[in-house]
Amino acid sequence: MNDLRYPIGQFTYKRPITEEMIDTWIQEIEDLPNELTKAIKDLDQKQLDTPYRVGGWTVRQVVHHVVDSHMNSYIRFKLALTEKNPTIKPYKEEKWAELPDSKLPVDVSLVMLDSLHKRWVNLLYSLEIEDLEKTFNHPETGETKLAVAIGLYAWHGRHHTAHITSLRKRLNW
């Protein structure tokens, strides 16, 4: 049986990371607002409030989570570019998904995601090779190079989009 938590598998990448990989990942980050918008197109309120799996988040919560996560990532990139290996602040994503703003219409987060990604992608395309080696420190997962973080967040967007598209396929929406 497929693991509904990881419809595209867990994040992995080939080493060494190449410029082509970075370019592909940045393009995936750039495409995410459109891909996520397409994934929820024509879903009604009941469908948006359907969990993608038993015990999982609703489609609505997934959309809001993507924005929460990518806002945090954008800030982590800016910190890593302006400080030496900064320790970033983790957050309790499962608790954030329960806050009242996670019940707002998904359009609110889609607009935010589009604007955020325009800024983030602009920043990513401006990076020099040496910038990709810069790091941030996560108190739980350790040091992460920006090159790896680009891949991780490209995967993250595809991962959550696949939660929605695989749910649609399973339920014939």
Curated annotation (Swiss-Prot):
Pfam families: DinB_2. Zn(2+) binds at H65, H156, H160. Its EC number is 3.-.-.-. Keywords: Cytoplasm, Hydrolase, Metal-binding, Zinc. The keyword Manganese does not apply. The keyword Zinc applies. GO terms for molecular function: hydrolase activity; zinc ion binding. Its cofactor is Zn(2+). SUPFAM superfamilies: DinB/YfiT-like putative metalloenzymes. It is an enzyme of class 3 (hydrolase). Binds 1 zinc ion per subunit. It is found in: Cytoplasm. One of its GO terms (cellular component) is cytoplasm. Belongs to the metal hydrolase YfiT family. Homodimer. Possible metal-dependent hydrolase. This is Putative metal-dependent hydrolase BC_2708. It comes from Bacillus cereus (strain ATCC 14579 / DSM 31 / CCUG 7414 / JCM 2152 / NBRC 15305 / NCIMB 9373 / NCTC 2599 / NRRL B-3711).
